[in-house]
Swiss-Prot record:
It is a multi-pass membrane protein. InterPro entries: ENaC (IPR001873), ENaC_chordates (IPR004724), ENaC_CS (IPR020903). Residues 1-57, 574-647 are cytoplasmic. This is one of the three pore-forming subunits of the heterotrimeric epithelial sodium channel (ENaC), a critical regulator of sodium balance and fluid homeostasis. ENaC operates in epithelial tissues, where it mediates the electrodiffusion of sodium ions from extracellular fluid through the apical membrane of cells, with water following osmotically. Belongs to the amiloride-sensitive sodium channel (TC 1.A.6) family. SCNN1B subfamily. This is Epithelial sodium channel subunit beta. Its main location: membrane. It comes from Xenopus laevis (African clawed frog). Disulfide bonds join 104-291, 215-222, 268-275, 381-468, 406-464, 410-460, 419-446, 421-435. GO terms for cellular component: apical plasma membrane; cytoplasmic vesicle membrane; plasma membrane; sodium channel complex.
Length: 647
């Protein structure tokens, strides 16, 4: 039975092979005529059935409309391949998770804790300020000593030699004069005043610039980084020195130097229920020191939700920033720094945070923007950052992916690769160490070179992609004085007692901050993307264009495909036949007669005159042989012939 099936299958494939080898059996012209006569498209039928003039007209119309169809098809296909999206927006109110709230003091360390560590640096900055006097009464004697304060101060070269602070005198632009502020041998006198009383501030700022001298390769290559303000230059220089100093301090030591949660957070209330600093999670920020997160939602923590709008159903806090503990040369702003962010995401307070001013009540109403992007190929977003070729240095905090964490991690990788050390403000990669002036004397010029590099910035931006699902918090902020003049005495007494159980007033208007954070009447706005085009849209529009211009359908396309296949089939068979004939012509011998023998060749060479010309030879007809005429071959006996003798 199996053998019979195999034989039938073999015969079927043999017949199919013969049909393929034979081809459709038509010429190109016959196929085209058949197509025009049998297709469901209207135009081609007119080409073969109308008169000569109408044939030309219908032929032109058919070509024009066919061109329009193919053009529209191209536009539709390109639109589909562009993977466009449509955006939908919905606004409303519902019970939602309350955002995570990160609180920091704008000043990272208590001055009483770090004063011994920064004593020499602060004296250095104070001396530099005396040598750069910005006093309107003194008319800007920039290089004059203050004879009553630090005229005889000698600066320690070990602290400042790595990054000298200078003033550039550009009175003569072709020959600028550079004055080193920290040069102990320089002459500073009132006679060397760089600004006269008749000069205005604009002329002064254009002629004299405070700059940092950045040198590499053992001070053989130096550049000057200019600043428009001496205050800005000193603060930038102070931050660099501070980074180098605290890079040698372990994390536990830096945490002890900062503000404790019980000192920063005085009162807490959420949804009308009391809370305390114990409901906050500690995190260390390189810029603001100890920070505390409410409702972060890490593993094992329950997230809090809010079901009603208004301040009574939100978070209420009273903070004490202890402005008396501020570092004099580090932070020029007195405030609390806060940021609202998504649960389990790292708070980038410096980049995205806002300030809350002391002596005020700051109310923040929140609107949640939920963004949903389409994945590839509709966008280049990433789901969880696993496909990003940048190591997430913030993964140690068990936080989700964000574009800020990616950009900072990318910059830190470039810093380690180029400068051979890591920057103090970013997490430390494995196998690297933070930059210090003693171990890495060239790190500051390298750091500025990377920070100012457009190529590095664009490279990191191209590597880091936005998350497909993200949440942003739109805030409306209002402020009022708090407490009022009539209530401040008893409020400060109560807060001071609750803070340290003392009847002495330790809390005052310069350090107190009150915060109200709550949802608006409409607390969420969902912005989601969906595909603007799909396969159904593409097929529908392709068919619509074809039906409108040509009056055809999918069957017409199949018929056209059939005629194309038949034409290709005929072409292939013709090519194979041509190739076969060409091979046979190559195999055919050049001479039709058999080659001559050796004796014939010798005779033709010795007596060529006897050789006859085959072309002149006329063949002799061979006479035909008549058929035999025997009586024995006859079937019937022949009649006797009478002779004359008998007659």
């Amino acid at each position: 039975m199996i053998h019979g099936k195999m034989k039938r299958l073999k015969r079927y494939f043999t017949r199919a092979l013969h049909r393929i080898q034979k081809g459709p059996g038509y010429t190109y012209k016959e196929l085209l005529v058949w197509f025009c006569d049998n297709t469901n498209t209207h135009g081609p039928k007119r080409i073969i059935k109308e008169g000569p003039k109408k044939r030309v007209m219908w032929f032109i119309l058919t070509l024009v409309f066919a061109g329009l169809v193919f053009w529209q098809w191209g536009v539709l296909i390109l639109t589909y391949l562009s993977y466009g999206v449509s955006v939908s927006l919905s606004i409303g109110f519902k019970t939602m998770e309350f955002p995570a709230v990160t609180l920091c003091n704008a000043n990272p360390f208590k001055y009483s804790r770090v004063k011994p560590l920064l004593k020499e640096l602060d004296e250095l900055v104070a001396t530099a300020l005396d040598r750069i006097q910005f006093s309107s009464q003194n008319q800007g004697n920039t290089f004059t000593h203050n004879n009553q304060t630090r005229q005889n101060v000698t600066l320690d070269p070990a602290l400042w030699n790595h990054i000298p602070l200078v003033v550039i005198d550009e009175t003569d632009p072709r020959n600028p004069i550079i004055h080193n502020i920290f040069d102990n041998n320089a002459v500073y006198s009132k006679n060397s005043s760089i600004r006269n009383s008749s000069e205005d501030q604009t002329s002064y700022s254009q002629r004299y610039k405070v700059a940092m001298k950045l040198c590499t390769n053992n001070n053989t290559q130096c550049v000057y980084r200019n600043f428009t303000s001496g205050v800005q230059a000193l603060r930038e220089w102070y931050l660099l020195q501070l980074s180098s100093i605290f890079s040698n301090v372990p994390l536990s030591g830096r945490i002890d130097m900062g503000f404790k949660a019980e000192d920063l957070i005085l009162t807490c209330l959420f949804g009308g229920q009391p809370c305390s600093y114990r409901n906050f999670t500690h995190i260390y920020d390189a810029d603001y020191g100890n920070c505390y997160i409410f409702n972060w939602g890490q593993e094992g923590e329950n997230t809090m939700s809010s079901a009603n709008p208004g301040a009574d159903f939100g978070l209420k806090l009273v903070l004490d920033i202890e402005q008396g503990e501020y570092l004099p040369f580090l932070q020029t702003t007195a405030a609390a720094r806060l940021i609202l962010h998504q649960q389990r995401s790292f708070p980038f307070v410096k980049d995205l945070g806002i300030y809350a001013m002391p002596g005020t009540e700051t109310s923040i109403s929140v609107l949640v923007d939920q963004l949903e992007h389409m994945e590839a190929p509709y966008s280049s977003c990433t789901v969880n950052g696993s496909d990003i070729p940048v190591q997430n240095l913030y993964a140690e905090f068990n936080s989700s992916y964000s574009i800020q964490s990616c950009l900072r991690s990318c910059y830190q990788e470039e810093m380690v690769k180029t400068c051979k050390c890591a920057h103090y403000q970013y997490p430390l990669p494995n196998g690297s160490e933070y930059c210090t002036n003693m171990k890495h004397p060239d790190w500051v010029p390298c750091y500025y070179s990377l920070r100012d590099s457009v190529a590095i910035r664009e490279n990191c931006i191209s590597l880091c992609q936005q998350p497909c699902n993200d949440t942003h918090y739109k805030m409306v902020i209002s402020m009022a004085d708090w407490p009022s003049a009539g209530a401040e005495d008893w409020i400060f007494h109560v807060l001071s007692y609750e803070k340290d159980s003392s009847h002495n007033i330790t809390v005052n208007r310069n350090g107190i901050v009150r915060l109200n954070i709550y949802f608006q009447e409409f607390n969420y706005r969902s912005i989601s993307e969906s595909e603007a085009t799909n396969v159904v849209w593409l097929l529908s529009n392709l068919g619509g264009q074809f039906g409108f211009w040509m009056g055809g359908s999918v069957l017409c396309i199949i018929e056209f495909g059939e005629i194309i296949i038949d034409c290709m089939w005929i072409t292939i068979l013709k090519f194979l036949a041509w190739s076969r004939n060409r091979r046979q012509r190559r195999k055919r011998p050049q001479y039709s007669d058999p080659p001559p023998t050796v004796s014939e060749l010798v005779e033709a060479h010795t007596n060529s005159g006897f050789q006859h010309d085959d072309g002149d030879h006329v063949p002799v007809d061979i006479p035909g042989t008549p058929p035999p005429n025997y009586d024995s071959l006859r079937v019937n006996t022949a009649e006797p012939v009478s002779s004359d003798e008998e007659n």
